Amino acid sequence: MDTDVFRRHANCRCLVEYDNGSGVYKNAHSKRFYKDRQEEIKKIDIERRKELDNKQNNNKRILDNSRKSGIIKDELKTDKQRQHMIASPGYKEGKSYIYGDEKTAEDLYNEFSGKGDLIEYKGEWLKKERITAERTIGVYIDQNGVATETNRFMIIYSKSGYHIYPRR
């Protein structure tokens, strides 16, 4: 079908097709183009979902293998986490902080671990995961001291545990 189609009005999804050879316009309405496009979109959506599922399964497999082999530990590293909680005595001035306490950090970990982007460098996992939540989780403080609420955070994994901090 030619890309030069005529629409009856701005919001109409029906297309008026015409014969390119004779130039005579036919008043034939067709929803074929719209239906074909919808099918294409569905196929693309299915492919994207499969990619995401494969990525999440791969992330979970990497994390599970790392836990089993002792590379990372499923326990909150409280001393590091307190540096990123403004209400705690261990908070370091100028660091990004999450809203809530250690329980909040554990809840974020349980909800989002394995669902973000594992950070790799030259094919090796750096024991970091980049996550985007649907809700605000804390405040990111940049190098100039400007504070911005954010729904993004990092999980840093290690042999002695994990900790979480907001990112931009």
Feature locations, PLM:
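Functional cores of ribonucleases/endoribonucleases
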Residues: M1, K60-R168
